[in-house]
Amino acid sequence: MKAVRVHAFDAPPVIEEVTQPVLRPGRTLVRMEAATVGHIDRTVWRGSFLKHPPFPYTPGVEAAGVVVASAVYASGQRVWLRGSGLGTLFDGTWCELIDAPDEALGLLPDGVPAAIGAAFFSPSTSAWVALHDVARLSAAESVLVTGATGAVGSLAVQLALDAGADVTALVADAAQAARMPSGAKVLVLGNEPGSSMDSISADLLVDTVGGGVLAAALARVKPGGRAVLVGYTAGNTLTLDIAHFLQRDVSLLPLNMFRREPAGRAAAPDLLARLADGRLKLDVQPFALESAAQAMDWISQRGHRGRAVLTMGR
């Protein structure tokens, strides 16, 4: 079967023929239909993750497909896959057939396309857990979301609106502003992030980008408010004036989805139902399995919309 293989940190991913897996106890054989290319895959590939599979390895933490053989799932059932060491401890999902740990699978409703099933878990559960488990969002609170056209940011905007919050979405330009859902206030980020946000005051900040944008957005959180830190694509450092920070009394709340994955899995069926009936929308950008390197490059570019997904041709 075909699989994407990585032979060294930062080495270009290549397509190779590898031996097909066989069914083992505690595992399910799944024919892949779509596999996500995410920032965690890049982190492992660059050698910046805490662990990595032995070289050469097949990347891929998330995917969707159809069960071929299992002691737990019926043959032909549609499933999504995520975590349990996939792509971080052993070979992952960028392949045609995988033997995945049974606990990594969840049922995928018929109304959800495979590409969405592969891509939904990380951004939708991150947004849900950030708002409801970490921040404890209440209806009618004001919420500022940075990186609002990214996968997590866009879903945070949608879920906060659905919860009855007053939402302001921070975007990079007018073209991105036009893509925001109705009901959200939209603020275009200028060359000076701080001055762009002068008119904003929020009970809760959901920051998906980090860096200078986070520093500027923190100043717009009301005293006693909260800031959930989700991502760092714009920079992984934050400098604080401690005296000023103590006076403002804003709680900095990190989102660690490895620790909170049980909460994400509990929310997954409801989130999939919302994606199936259109209450939630998630953009995906398809790439062929052979184009994994291009997909890795695409997600590294600022301003990309949605998630990259490798699709397996029949």
Where are these predicted regions, by residue range?
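NAD(P)H cofactor-binding loop motif with strongest signal on the N-terminal glycine-rich segment
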Residues: G147-A148, V209, Y232
